[in-house]
Amino acid sequence: MVQVGVIGGTGYVGAELIRLLSNHNKIKISGISSTSYEGKSINSLYPGFYDLKELVCEKDDEVIKRSDLIFLALPSGVSEPIVEKAVAKDKICIDMGADFRFKNESSYKKWYGKNFITPKLHESSVYGLPELNREYIKKSRVIGNPGCYATSVQIGVLPLISKGLIEEKGIIADCKSGLTGAGKTLSESSHFVNCNESFSAYKVANHRHTPEIEENLNSVSKEGVKLTFIPHLIPINRGILSTIYTTPKDPIDIEKIHQKYCEFYKEEPFVRILPLGKVSKINNVRLSNYCCISIHYDSENNKLIIISCLDNMIKGAAGQAIQNMNIVLGFDEKEGLTALPAVF
């Protein structure tokens, strides 16, 4: 069995990763690390992980030593030195922060305030959106797992961008996320009394997923994508719903657009295109690795509207990381990820 380690295994994403990996038939969790909880067992932090008594938080180096592949569930800007060390020891790394989501160093510096530490590592890394980069992922040793909003928006518009069907400047992505998207660290915005029975936008036109979406869509763009992205927090635990407004270049037949989506994603194991007239919703995807898309046309205003939903903790984070692991290790891409969405 492949030995898999988790660096930063006690946050929401790390815990979700451990939960999913525990049901994977091709790997064994070799260890988890945490600077905050070193020496504590994972089931003392998450009692629902009762059967994982043997998983005790260790130092990063101990986990790296015993692992063939490393997941890094760390804050953005922290992973790169650890990845450099692990790659030198011939380990495969899947980083779930933003450290390897960009090829453009100036863009990364503008939005994250850091330069690349090891530029050659970035040259060889791959952006881990399977629906865009599957063939590159297969050959990579360093994979930058996409952001949750970025995954939802890109899967939503990839068929339109790649086929040149819409105006690529002026796309509007209006996105809503559950509170787990804000992470485990306490904050005013995620405090119960500030989010319960409320609904708010944040980082309006200033969210770090904007340049990530633009850079990676531009790999298939003909004109250069420019995006207005407005994220919102809603008082649910998990899930993202992205409503994406686009302007078709030419008069469209909505049935033909629907057919193009079905054709574009027909080989994708985790993308679901709803029939025309149906509306995608978070309950279509909760607790699953699926991205569910519905397609709508406002003929009065010539707006093609895409609604893209996913579970931000799974297809938006831990599940997509496991999907990337399956690809790079040559496993069935669906291994460990076949659970259907929860009904409610």
From Swiss-Prot:
Pfam families per the UniProt record, alphabetical: Semialdhyde_dh, Semialdhyde_dhC_1
Catalytic activity: N-acetyl-L-glutamate 5-semialdehyde + phosphate + NADP(+) = N-acetyl-L-glutamyl 5-phosphate + NADPH + H(+)
Active site: C148
Any GO CC annotation of this UniProt entry: cytoplasm
PROSITE patterns: ARGC (PS01224)
EC number(s) given by UniProt: 1.2.1.38
Main location: cytoplasm
NCBIfam families in alphabetical order: argC
Function: Catalyzes the NADPH-dependent reduction of N-acetyl-5-glutamyl phosphate to yield N-acetyl-L-glutamate 5-semialdehyde.
Name this polypeptide is given: N-acetyl-gamma-glutamyl-phosphate reductase
Organism ancestry: Bacteria, Bacillati, Bacillota, Clostridia, Eubacteriales
